A protein has these predicted regions:
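Positively charged n-region of N-terminal signal peptides that target proteins for export
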Residues: 1-5
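Bacterial N-terminal signal peptides
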Residues: 7-15
Length: 119
């Protein structure tokens, strides 16, 4: 009986550690892990901005460049593949896909079948 309990305990422990590793990392987490301070994106008025639904490009372009620059960086090697930043909808706000402190979404998949991995 003790052996079964020990095996069950360690099995549960391994299962929980595997689940913890599968937790998605949000963009905010990635930025913090790279040493980017909250104020870089949110500015000095961070508490006021956190209450707003900020759909602007400005915080992103400071580090990542403007839309055409991002499109060049994300051009796939295979011309058969689609570039998520070269779109017919125009220059959508970055936050259309990249949610910062929430899970990102593949906006293109609303109408198309593109298997983009959106960080």
């Amino acid at each position: 009986l003790k052996t079964k309990l020990v095996v069950l305990f360690f099995g549960a422990l391994l299962s929980f550690s595997a689940i913890a590793q599968d937790k998605p990392q949000f963009l905010g987490d990635r930025h913090v892990a790279r040493g980017v301070q909250c104020q870089v994106c949110h500015g000095p008025q961070i508490s006021a901005q956190l209450k707003e639904d900020d759909q602007r490009h400005e915080p992103c372009v400071q580090c990542h460049g403007f839309y055409d620059q991002v499109a060049k960086k994300t051009t796939p090697e295979n011309p058969e593949e689609m570039n998520p930043h070269s779109q017919h909808d125009g220059n959508l706000p970055c936050s259309t896909c990249h949610k910062g402190h929430k899970p990102s979404v593949n906006y293109c998949a609303e109408c198309h079948y593109y298997n983009f991995k959106v960080p």
